[in-house]
Structures are given as structure tokens and as C-alpha cells.
């Protein structure tokens, strides 16, 4: 038997229902915030991620699915969504005009890492990217969008925020941090590598010993220039005004190299201690990194598998939907196919091609999670009627075929 690859999972039944629910909710909220859909390729040139995600990141260093294709191109399966969207933005020369572009995306991402609960080698993300707006109010709106999504999905969260500063204030902080790191011994190999490539990433290390060494490290948000400080204060003010609880985490850095200024992360204890379920921030430098005109960008990405795990833990019930249409005698099936064809213009209809007893049909309708049950037997056929049962409300009656649209 051929099985799915390790760390890759089929989505069906309850998983598929939860996936559809999450995507539908995210899309509705994103559209309400003025975002439109973008779809980018799963396969990109490796250079895109080496320049955007950064050579010092674990993604590029350890986790990319990369290979040489038949055209001798060094390509990889996308490990994250932002870089591809920025590439599309630049390729279409949208960086050359002054209009704001707001996009949302969803789909598969690929990273070769150890599979665990809520983390797979092929995983799914929903994300948004906003280009051309420098205002911190755009950062706040994107955070509020996530708050609304989690509210609709009934997911409890803790919001962490920080400011990573800008090109004006970061060089001095970087200098202070390197001086601090040089004064300490015992950092892991990853931290030593990051110290030379991008020292701020050392703060992101998950090693407990390294974190203990960082207890008295200089803080990002205490080294901000006046402009970054003002924006960070506005961000906190907006969140408070909108009733959003948050915590300033001075050691929060995004795992990717292109972030600046606003950084945020949503964590949940519903699938394990402090599991990240979404994160993002501002990345004004990324467009320029990828040969675009210097501009502004901010966005987030959400891990769908972790959201599904939370929903399933809550025993999320699959809602009944659609119509189950059936016959007790094979001679009525052709007539029912005609009825089903008309109903399918407005409704989801599952038509059974087998003649069965009423109890068997009802059992099958229940297995298929249908909301409405319609059946034709000899008596119904003679009266141009159908037996109707609402499986959610447990209501049943005889209805005329001519009244079907009105009843449904």
C-alpha cells in the first residue's frame, strides 16, 4: 500500500469541514477590510527566499524542499507566502505606482522539519499583505482583522506585540546587542551563526539555556527613535481603544529577517503551552531587497492546521447541509434526476441511484449529514409529491413537487 509521505496529511471529513470553515471565515473578514484574493505559484526560484527570508534563517538553512529542475533552475517549494506575494507585486510593476494594494492568500507551504501536533511538512496558511501604506494605523487594522477572525471562530488567544525599530535606530541597538552577546559564553551553534549574520535573530532562539543567557539583554523597544516610539504608542492606544488585551514582549522578533517596526504574535494554550497560531508585522525593507522600488509592506500569516486542532478539540460539530433525494423504487430515479438537476441551480443535492427502504435511506442521509430528506414512493408518485423531513429540526410532511422551491 502506498501511503502519504511523512508530515503530509489528507484533509477529509471533519478536517476538511474545519478547513473550509476557517478559510471561509478568514476570507469574509479580509474582504470586509478591503482585501482581495491573490494566488501565487507553489514553486519559486530558491533565490527569492534566500534574499527575503534570509540566509541565517532555519527555513533557508535547514528546511527548504529544493532541487534542480530539468531546465537547470534551482527551485524550491514555497516555505512561506509573503515573499511570493511581494515578488508578484514587483513583477507586475505595482511598486511603481502610489496606490495601496491589499491582498489575502491561502494554500500549502512546505518545510522539511520534524512533524508534530499542529506542525507538518506540508502545511496550510492564510495570510494578508498590504503594500503602499506607511501608517501604523494599517498595522493596527491588520491586528484587529485577526482579532475579528479569532472572535468568529471562538478561539481564545494572547496577543504579544513589539517594535523592531527602523534603519535609523536599529544600527545602534545591533551594536549594543553584539557587545552583549560577545560578553556571554554558552550560546548554541545556531545562535553563534545568527550572531554573525543577523544578531537580532538570537533573541528568537527556543533553547532554554540560551534564553536564560538573554535575561539581561538590551531591549529592542528601549532603543527606538522618536518616530518608532510614537508609532508604537499609537499602536497600543488603538488596541486599547478597541478593547484588545495585549502584552508588550520586548524579546519578540519575527522568525524572518525582513521585519521592521511593528511585530506581533498570537499564541494559544488550547493546543499546548504558548503555541503560536498567527504572527506578522511590518516589512518595509523587503520590497527593496527583491529589487522593487522602496516602499511599505505589512501583513500576517496564520497556521491553519493549528486552528483546526483547536476547533476539533472543542468538538466542533459538522453542520447539516444540503438535500438527500431518493426513491423507494428504481422506476422513479429518472424523474428524481430531473428534479435534482433543477434544484442544484440553488441547492446542494445528493441523489441516491439505489432503490431502498425508507429506513435505509434515512440512515444514509444521516451519514451524509444532509439537512433535508426527500423521498418518492408509490403513493408520492401518484400524487406528484415527495416525503419531506428536516433532519435538523425533526419535522416531516408531504409536499407537492410544484411547491418544492417555495418550501426549500
Curated annotation (Swiss-Prot):
Domain of life of the native organism: Bacteria
Record CDD domains: HisRS-like_core
Any one GO MF annotation of this record: histidine-tRNA ligase activity
Biological processes, Gene Ontology terms: histidyl-tRNA aminoacylation
Keywords: Aminoacyl-tRNA synthetase, ATP-binding, Cytoplasm, Ligase, Nucleotide-binding, Protein biosynthesis
Subcellular location, record wording: Cytoplasm
Gene3D superfamilies named in the record: Anticodon-binding domain (3.40.50.800), Bira Bifunctional Protein, Domain 2 (3.30.930.10)
SUPFAM superfamilies per UniProt: Class II aaRS ABD-related, Class II aaRS and biotin synthetases
Keyword Aminoacyl-tRNA synthetase listed: yes
Membrane-spanning residues: none
Catalyzed reactions: tRNA(His) + L-histidine + ATP = L-histidyl-tRNA(His) + AMP + diphosphate + H(+)
Listed GO CC annotations: cytoplasm
Segments forming a coiled coil: none
EC number: 6.1.1.21
Family: Belongs to the class-II aminoacyl-tRNA synthetase family.
Subunit structure: Homodimer.
HAMAP family in UniProt: His_tRNA_synth
PANTHER family: HISTIDINE--TRNA LIGASE, MITOCHONDRIAL-RELATED, HISTIDYL-TRNA SYNTHETASE
Protein name, entry field: Histidine--tRNA ligase
Amino acid at each position: 500500500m502506498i501511503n502519504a509521505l511523512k508530515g503530509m496529511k489528507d484533509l477529509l471529513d471533519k478536517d476538511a469541514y474545519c478547513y473550509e470553515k476557517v478559510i471561509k471565515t478568514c476570507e469574509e473578514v479580509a474582504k470586509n477590510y478591503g482585501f482581495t484574493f491573490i494566488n501565487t505559484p507553489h514553486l519559486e526560484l530558491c533565490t527569492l527566499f534566500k534574499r527575503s527570508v534570509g540566509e541565517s534563517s532555519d527555513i533557508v538553512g535547514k528546511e527548504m524542499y529544493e532541487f534542480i529542475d530539468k531546465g537547470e533552475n534551482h527551485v524550491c517549494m514555497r516555505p512561506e507566502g509573503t515573499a511570493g506575494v511581494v515578488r508578484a507585486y514587483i513583477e507586475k510593476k505595482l511598486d511603481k505606482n502610489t496606490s495601496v494594494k491589499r491582498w489575502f492568500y491561502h494554500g500549502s507551504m512546505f518545510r522539511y522539519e520534524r512533524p508534530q501536533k499542529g506542525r507538518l511538512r506540508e502545511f496550510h496558511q492564510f495570510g494578508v499583505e498590504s503594500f503602499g501604506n506607511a501608517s501604523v494605523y494599517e498595522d493596527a487594522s491588520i491586528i484587529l482583522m485577526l482579532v475579528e477572525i479569532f472572535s468568529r471562530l471562538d478561539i481564545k488567544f494572547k496577543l504579544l506585540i513589539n517594535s523592531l525599530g527602523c534603519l535609523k535606530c536599529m544600527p545602534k541597538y545591533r551594536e549594543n546587542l553584539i557587545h552583549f552577546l560577545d560578553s556571554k559564553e554558552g550560546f548554541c551553534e545556531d545562535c553563534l551563526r545568527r550572531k554573525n549574520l543577523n544578531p537580532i535573530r538570537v533573541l528568537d532562539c527556543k533553547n532554554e539555556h540560551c534564553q536564560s543567557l538573554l535575561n539581561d539583554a538590551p531591549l529592542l523597544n528601549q532603543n527606538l527613535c522618536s518616530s518608532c516610539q510614537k508609532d508604537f504608542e499609537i499602536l497600543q492606544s488603538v488596541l486599547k481603544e478597541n478593547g484588545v488585551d495585549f502584552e508588550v514582549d520586548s524579546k519578540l522578533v519575527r522568525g524572518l529577517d525582513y521585519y521592521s517596526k511593528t511585530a506581533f504574535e498570537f499564541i494559544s494554550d488550547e493546543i499546548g503551552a504558548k503555541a503560536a497560531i498567527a504572527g506578522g508585522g511590518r516589512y518595509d525593507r523587503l520590497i527593496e531587497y527583491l529589487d522593487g522600488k522602496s516602499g511599505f509592506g505589512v501583513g500576517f500569516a496564520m497556521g491553519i492546521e493549528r486552528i483546526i486542532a483547536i476547533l476539533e478539540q472543542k468538538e466542533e460539530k459538522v453542520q447539516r447541509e444540503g438535500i438527500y433525494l431518493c426513491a423507494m423504487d428504481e422506476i422513479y430515479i429518472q424523474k428524481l434526476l430531473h428534479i435534482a438537476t433543477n434544484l442544484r441551480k440553488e441547492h446542494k443535492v445528493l441523489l441516491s441511484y439505489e432503490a431502498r427502504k425508507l429506513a435505509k435511506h434515512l440512515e444514509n442521509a444521516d451519514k451524509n449529514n444532509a439537512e433535508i430528506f426527500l423521498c418518492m414512493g408509490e403513493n408520492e408518485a401518484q400524487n406528484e409529491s415527495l416525503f419531506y423531513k428536516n433532519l435538523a429540526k425533526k419535522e416531516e410532511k408531504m409536499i407537492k413537487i410544484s411547491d418544492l422551491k417555495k418550501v426549500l
